[in-house]
Design a protein with these regions (language model features):
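Non-catalytic, surface beta->alpha helical segment in thiol-disulfide oxidoreductase systems
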Residues: 94-142
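Conserved strand-to-helix beginnings and helix N-cap segments that scaffold or border functional pockets
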Residues: 52-57, 84-85, 123-124
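Thiol-based oxidoreductase modules, predominantly thioredoxin-like and allied folds used
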Residues: 23, 44, 67-86
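Short, well-ordered amphipathic alpha-helices
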Residues: 58-60, 88, 134
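N-terminal leader/targeting and pre-domain segments
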Residues: 1-37, 138-143
């Protein structure tokens, strides 16, 4: 049974208010993966404390980086169950984990941050790792070669 929307709305808004696009159906996830040229970040959001105190603030900090994914999206584990399952199907080689953050480049997974990598870190550490991933995988080819 999904979490009540009234309970999770503030957790969704932590990301949507900073411009992260929600994907609420499997079709929306497939569309994002298939129709995003370049890099796509998918955040698996959740109700847990490490999502609230670490992952979401870390993502907000990281999105202030000059280089970032072409498109940033989110699914909500425990609420948008089918969309979350579909997003996780693109995280090849990784088990279900929430919160988690995957970066796909032209539909292929190139970076993954799982829950265990979030739990023991603060928002600044998470942001630092994400910005390193952005710099590596999201920079235009001309910048990446410099």
């Amino acid at each position: 049974m999904p979490y009540p929307e009234i309970m999770i709305r503030p957790f969704r808004e932590d990301l949507t208010r900073i411009g992260v696009e929600e994907l609420r159906t499997p079709e929306a996830v497939d569309d994002a993966v298939k129709n995003t040229s370049g890099t796509l970040m998918i955040v698996v959001n959740s109700v847990c404390g490490c999502a609230a105190g670490k992952a979401r603030p870390g993502i907000a900090l990281a999105l202030g980086n000059e280089i970032k994914p072409d498109r940033v999206t989110t699914v909500f584990a425990g609420a948008d169950i089918e969309a979350t399952d579909r997003a996780r199907s693109y995280f090849t080689g990784y088990g279900p984990s929430s919160p988690s953050i995957g970066i796909l480049k032209d539909g292929e997974l190139v970076y993954m941050m799982e829950r265990y990598q979030i739990e023991g870190r603060g928002p600044e550490q998470i942001a630092n790792e994400l910005t390193q991933a952005f710099d590596k995988f999201c920079a235009p080819a001309t910048m990446a070669a410099v």
